[in-house]
Regions:
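Short S/T/G/P-rich N-terminal loop/turn motif that feeds into the first structured element of a domain
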Residues: 1-51, 57-71, 78-102
Length: 102
């Protein structure tokens, strides 16, 4: 399994509800249709910081998810809400345990 973590700094805090709504309504359904999709999590850390974790079977599928997310931001006209490019970390998942996430 491959994980892609994106950290977004400086997100417009006045648009948090709009952003999270659009992620849940349109981005996650698009990501879930990609080959190898295993999961997606969006984390609001506060102070204009959001992180996301995408899980896919292969690195190539993870890269495809990053391209889709970038296109999605443009298509939804959300670039101004995300003034800084994301910091992206990706790699092979070498340890995990599934459980209930609240």
């Amino acid at each position: 399994m491959h994980a892609t973590i994106r950290r977004y700094d400086g997100v417009d805090q006045n648009r948090t509800a709009e952003l999270t709504g659009k992620v849940n309504e349109s981005l996650i359904p698009k990501l879930s249709k990609l080959d190898g999709f295993k999961g997606y999590y969006l984390i609001e850390a506060g102070n204009g910081i959001f992180s996301s974790i995408g899980l896919f079977e292969t690195p190539e599928q993870g890269e495809a998810s990053s391209k889709l997310a970038s296109s999605w931001l443009r298509d939804e006209k959300l670039e101004t809400a995300f003034p800084n490019p994301p910091k992206i970390t990706s790699g092979k998942v070498v340890g995990h345990k599934n459980g209930v996430v609240a």
